[in-house]
Design a protein with these regions (language model features):
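Beta-propeller-forming repeat regions
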Residues: 1-185
Length: 185
Protein backbone atom coordinates (compact mmCIF):
# COMPACT_ATOMS: atom_id res chain seq x y z
CA UNK A 1 0.00 0.00 0.00
CA UNK A 2 0.86 3.69 0.08
CA UNK A 3 0.92 5.73 3.29
CA UNK A 4 1.46 9.40 4.10
CA UNK A 5 3.46 10.15 7.25
CA UNK A 6 2.75 13.50 8.90
CA UNK A 7 5.77 14.87 10.79
CA UNK A 8 4.66 15.70 14.33
CA UNK A 9 8.14 16.84 15.35
CA UNK A 10 10.69 15.38 17.72
CA UNK A 11 11.03 12.21 15.63
CA UNK A 12 7.32 11.35 15.81
CA UNK A 13 5.06 10.71 12.82
CA UNK A 14 1.38 10.02 12.27
CA UNK A 15 0.52 7.57 9.47
CA UNK A 16 -2.43 7.95 7.11
CA UNK A 17 -2.98 4.94 4.84
CA UNK A 18 -3.83 6.27 1.39
CA UNK A 19 -4.15 3.05 -0.61
CA UNK A 20 -4.11 -0.61 0.40
CA UNK A 21 -3.68 -3.69 -1.80
CA UNK A 22 -3.43 -7.45 -1.41
CA UNK A 23 0.07 -8.99 -1.65
CA UNK A 24 -0.63 -10.44 -5.13
CA UNK A 25 -1.53 -6.97 -6.47
CA UNK A 26 2.16 -6.59 -7.36
CA UNK A 27 2.65 -2.86 -6.75
CA UNK A 28 5.96 -1.89 -8.33
CA UNK A 29 6.25 1.93 -8.46
CA UNK A 30 4.36 5.14 -7.78
CA UNK A 31 4.83 8.80 -8.54
CA UNK A 32 2.93 11.99 -7.67
CA UNK A 33 1.57 14.37 -10.32
CA UNK A 34 -1.39 16.75 -10.56
CA UNK A 35 -3.52 15.37 -13.41
CA UNK A 36 -6.60 17.57 -12.96
CA UNK A 37 -4.88 20.90 -12.15
CA UNK A 38 -6.54 21.27 -8.75
CA UNK A 39 -3.25 21.89 -6.94
CA UNK A 40 -3.26 18.52 -5.15
CA UNK A 41 -0.90 15.66 -6.00
CA UNK A 42 -2.55 12.64 -7.56
CA UNK A 43 -0.95 9.18 -7.57
CA UNK A 44 0.24 7.27 -10.63
CA UNK A 45 0.83 3.66 -9.64
CA UNK A 46 2.13 0.64 -11.52
CA UNK A 47 1.43 -2.91 -10.51
CA UNK A 48 3.04 -5.71 -12.44
CA UNK A 49 5.51 -7.38 -10.10
CA UNK A 50 4.72 -10.94 -11.06
CA UNK A 51 7.42 -13.11 -9.53
CA UNK A 52 6.62 -13.12 -5.81
CA UNK A 53 3.61 -15.45 -5.76
CA UNK A 54 2.70 -16.47 -9.31
CA UNK A 55 4.31 -16.02 -12.73
CA UNK A 56 1.05 -15.94 -14.71
CA UNK A 57 -0.20 -12.78 -16.40
CA UNK A 58 -2.85 -11.00 -14.37
CA UNK A 59 -5.59 -8.89 -15.95
CA UNK A 60 -5.41 -6.40 -13.08
CA UNK A 61 -1.75 -5.51 -13.71
CA UNK A 62 -1.11 -2.15 -15.33
CA UNK A 63 -1.01 1.60 -14.76
CA UNK A 64 -3.49 3.47 -12.59
CA UNK A 65 -4.21 7.10 -11.77
CA UNK A 66 -5.76 7.82 -8.37
CA UNK A 67 -7.24 11.32 -7.95
CA UNK A 68 -6.76 13.25 -4.71
CA UNK A 69 -10.00 14.81 -3.40
CA UNK A 70 -8.04 17.60 -1.66
CA UNK A 71 -8.17 15.82 1.70
CA UNK A 72 -5.74 13.09 0.63
CA UNK A 73 -8.43 10.53 -0.03
CA UNK A 74 -7.82 8.84 -3.38
CA UNK A 75 -10.14 7.25 -5.95
CA UNK A 76 -9.06 5.35 -9.06
CA UNK A 77 -9.77 7.47 -12.15
CA UNK A 78 -7.90 5.64 -14.95
CA UNK A 79 -6.53 2.16 -15.62
CA UNK A 80 -4.55 0.76 -18.54
CA UNK A 81 -3.87 -3.00 -18.44
CA UNK A 82 -0.21 -3.86 -19.11
CA UNK A 83 1.23 -7.18 -17.90
CA UNK A 84 4.47 -6.86 -15.98
CA UNK A 85 4.34 -3.09 -15.58
CA UNK A 86 7.46 -2.05 -13.68
CA UNK A 87 7.45 1.76 -13.74
CA UNK A 88 5.63 4.81 -15.07
CA UNK A 89 7.12 8.29 -15.23
CA UNK A 90 4.94 11.40 -15.55
CA UNK A 91 6.20 14.48 -17.41
CA UNK A 92 4.95 16.82 -20.12
CA UNK A 93 6.98 14.94 -22.73
CA UNK A 94 5.32 16.60 -25.75
CA UNK A 95 5.42 20.13 -24.25
CA UNK A 96 1.69 20.76 -24.66
CA UNK A 97 1.01 21.70 -21.03
CA UNK A 98 -0.46 18.45 -19.70
CA UNK A 99 1.11 15.41 -18.02
CA UNK A 100 1.96 12.44 -20.24
CA UNK A 101 3.06 8.97 -19.10
CA UNK A 102 5.99 6.78 -20.17
CA UNK A 103 5.84 3.19 -18.91
CA UNK A 104 7.93 0.04 -19.03
CA UNK A 105 6.81 -3.56 -18.63
CA UNK A 106 9.22 -6.36 -17.92
CA UNK A 107 7.76 -9.84 -17.50
CA UNK A 108 5.49 -10.21 -20.55
CA UNK A 109 8.17 -8.93 -22.89
CA UNK A 110 8.93 -12.23 -24.67
CA UNK A 111 5.29 -12.62 -25.76
CA UNK A 112 4.67 -8.96 -26.67
CA UNK A 113 7.97 -7.09 -27.07
CA UNK A 114 6.20 -3.91 -28.26
CA UNK A 115 4.71 -3.62 -24.74
CA UNK A 116 8.16 -3.28 -23.17
CA UNK A 117 7.97 0.51 -23.50
CA UNK A 118 4.69 2.38 -24.00
CA UNK A 119 4.28 6.16 -24.28
CA UNK A 120 0.88 7.62 -23.37
CA UNK A 121 0.11 11.04 -24.85
CA UNK A 122 -2.46 12.90 -22.75
CA UNK A 123 -5.40 13.77 -25.01
CA UNK A 124 -7.39 15.38 -22.16
CA UNK A 125 -10.16 14.19 -19.81
CA UNK A 126 -8.15 11.10 -18.82
CA UNK A 127 -7.86 9.85 -22.39
CA UNK A 128 -4.32 8.72 -23.17
CA UNK A 129 -3.14 7.61 -26.61
CA UNK A 130 -0.68 4.68 -26.28
CA UNK A 131 2.21 4.25 -28.72
CA UNK A 132 5.47 2.36 -28.87
CA UNK A 133 8.83 2.77 -30.62
CA UNK A 134 10.09 0.03 -32.98
CA UNK A 135 13.57 0.01 -31.37
CA UNK A 136 12.03 -0.38 -27.92
CA UNK A 137 10.86 -3.90 -28.88
CA UNK A 138 14.52 -5.01 -28.96
CA UNK A 139 15.14 -4.48 -25.24
CA UNK A 140 13.87 -6.01 -22.03
CA UNK A 141 13.47 -2.79 -20.07
CA UNK A 142 13.88 -3.02 -16.33
CA UNK A 143 14.70 0.59 -15.49
CA UNK A 144 13.79 4.02 -16.85
CA UNK A 145 14.58 7.63 -15.99
CA UNK A 146 13.62 11.00 -17.49
CA UNK A 147 15.51 14.28 -17.71
CA UNK A 148 17.14 16.67 -20.16
CA UNK A 149 20.15 14.43 -20.76
CA UNK A 150 21.29 16.13 -23.99
CA UNK A 151 20.71 19.69 -22.66
CA UNK A 152 18.43 20.74 -25.53
CA UNK A 153 15.55 21.96 -23.34
CA UNK A 154 13.17 19.01 -23.64
CA UNK A 155 12.64 15.90 -21.55
CA UNK A 156 14.45 12.76 -22.69
CA UNK A 157 13.84 9.17 -21.57
CA UNK A 158 16.60 6.63 -20.87
CA UNK A 159 15.72 2.92 -20.73
CA UNK A 160 17.99 0.24 -19.28
CA UNK A 161 17.71 -3.40 -20.38
CA UNK A 162 18.29 -6.63 -18.47
CA UNK A 163 18.50 -10.23 -19.65
CA UNK A 164 18.88 -13.32 -17.46
CA UNK A 165 21.07 -15.11 -20.02
CA UNK A 166 22.10 -15.30 -23.69
CA UNK A 167 19.25 -17.69 -24.59
CA UNK A 168 16.67 -15.21 -23.34
CA UNK A 169 18.39 -12.50 -25.37
CA UNK A 170 18.33 -14.66 -28.52
CA UNK A 171 14.63 -15.49 -28.12
CA UNK A 172 13.74 -11.80 -27.90
CA UNK A 173 15.89 -10.41 -30.68
CA UNK A 174 15.70 -13.40 -33.05
CA UNK A 175 18.04 -13.06 -35.99
CA UNK A 176 19.41 -9.67 -35.02
CA UNK A 177 23.12 -9.67 -34.18
CA UNK A 178 23.33 -10.13 -30.41
CA UNK A 179 25.96 -7.42 -30.13
CA UNK A 180 23.70 -4.86 -31.82
CA UNK A 181 20.68 -4.98 -29.50
CA UNK A 182 20.19 -1.93 -27.27
CA UNK A 183 21.10 -2.15 -23.61
CA UNK A 184 20.32 1.54 -23.36
CA UNK A 185 17.77 3.39 -25.47
Amino acid sequence: GISLFYNLGKGKFKEKKLLQFSPVFGASYFELADFNNDGYPDIVLTNGDNWDYSRTNKNYHGIRIYLNDGKYNFQEQWFFPLYGTAKAIVRDFDNDGDPDIAAIAFYDILEKPSNGFVYFSNEGNFHFKPSSLPNAALGKWLTMEAGDFDHDGDTDIVLGSYFHNIEEMRSLIGTVDILSFPQLL
